C-alpha cells in the first residue's frame, strides 16, 4: 500500500528508467536534465520542471506511427489505395448487393398461429404498415430473409433425421414446407 513514490526502487530499474527518459527526451523534443537525470520539457516563462515523460504540445512527425502507413504515405494516391485495400466491410460498388446474417443473433421461436395473430394485432395497434418508407433494397433483404428462414428444415425432417426419404418428404409436404 502507499503512494508510488513511497516504494523503494531497485538499482537496475532506476538505470533503465533513466535511459528510457533520455531516449524519450530525444524523440519528443524535450531535454534531459544534466544534473538530476530527470526529464524536462521546456515551457517558456514558467521555469517549472516536469518529471513525467509527457509529449504534450509536440507536433506530429512523419514516421511516428510505424504500423499505420496511411498516416505517413509517400503520396496521396498510395494513401487511397491502402485504405481501399483494407476496407473489408465497406465497398462502394456493393450497393446493389444484398445480404443478411447466416445465423440469427438470437434463437428464433417457431412461428405458430398464436404468434402470427399476436404479430398482426401488434402491427394494427401501431398503425399498420401504411406510411412506412418503401425501399427496394430493404424489400429484397426481407425477401431473401423470408426465403432463408422458411426454407430451412426443422431438425426432425430432412435427410439427417434418419427417416426414410418418402416419410420425411410427406411430413414436409403436410407442413407446407417446400423441398428440393
From Swiss-Prot:
It is found in: Host cell membrane. A lipid is attached at residue 2 (N-myristoyl glycine). GO terms for cellular component: host cell plasma membrane; membrane. The keyword Cytoplasm does not apply. Residues 88-97 have a biased composition (Acidic residues). GO terms for molecular function: GTP binding. InterPro entries: HIV-1_Nef_core_sf, HIV_Nef. Gene3D superfamilies: Nef Regulatory Factor. Keywords: AIDS, Host cell membrane, Host membrane, Host-virus interaction, Lipoprotein, Membrane, Myristate, Viral immunoevasion, Virulence. Residues 48-65 have a biased composition (Polar residues). Residues 88-96 are annotated as: Acidic. It is a lipid-anchor. Residues 1-103 are annotated as: Disordered. A motif (PxxP) lies at residues 104-107. Residues 1-11 have a biased composition (Basic residues). The N-terminal domain is composed of the N-myristoyl glycine and of a cluster of positively charged amino acids. It is required for inner plasma membrane targeting of Nef and virion incorporation, and thereby for infectivity. Homodimer. Interacts with host CD247/TCRZ; this interaction induces down-regulation of cell surface TCR/CD3 complexes. Factor of infectivity and pathogenicity, required for optimal virus replication. Alters numerous pathways of T-lymphocyte function and down-regulates immunity surface molecules in order to evade host defense and increase viral infectivity. Alters the functionality of other immunity cells, like dendritic cells, monocytes/macrophages and NK cells. One of the earliest and most abundantly expressed viral proteins. In infected CD4(+) T-lymphocytes, down-regulates cell surface expression of CD4, CD28, CD3, and MHC-I or MHC-II molecules. Belongs to the lentivirus primate group Nef protein family. This is Protein Nef.
Amino acid at each position: 500500500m502507499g503512494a508510488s513514490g513511497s516504494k523503494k526502487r531497485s538499482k537496475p530499474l532506476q538505470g533503465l528508467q533513466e535511459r528510457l527518459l533520455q531516449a524519450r527526451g530525444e524523440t519528443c523534443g524535450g531535454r534531459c536534465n544534466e544534473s538530476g537525470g530527470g526529464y524536462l520539457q521546456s515551457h517558456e516563462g514558467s521555469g517549472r520542471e516536469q518529471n513525467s515523460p509527457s509529449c504534450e504540445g509536440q507536433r506530429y512527425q512523419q514516421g511516428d506511427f510505424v504500423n499505420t502507413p496511411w498516416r505517413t504515405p509517400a503520396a496521396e494516391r498510395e494513401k487511397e489505395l491502402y485504405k481501399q485495400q483494407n476496407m473489408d466491410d465497406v465497398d462502394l460498388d456493393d450497393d446493389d448487393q444484398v445480404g443478411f446474417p447466416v445465423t440469427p443473433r438470437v434463437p428464433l421461436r417457431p412461428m405458430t398461429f398464436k404468434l402470427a395473430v399476436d404479430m398482426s394485432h401488434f402491427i394494427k395497434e401501431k398503425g399498420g404498415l401504411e406510411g412506412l418508407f418503401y425501399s427496394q433494397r430493404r424489400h429484397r433483404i426481407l425477401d431473401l430473409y423470408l426465403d432463408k428462414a422458411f426454407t430451412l428444415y426443422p431438425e426432425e425432417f430432412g435427410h439427417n433425421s434418419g427417416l426414410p426419404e418418402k416419410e420425411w418428404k410427406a411430413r414436409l409436404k403436410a407442413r407446407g414446407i417446400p423441398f428440393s
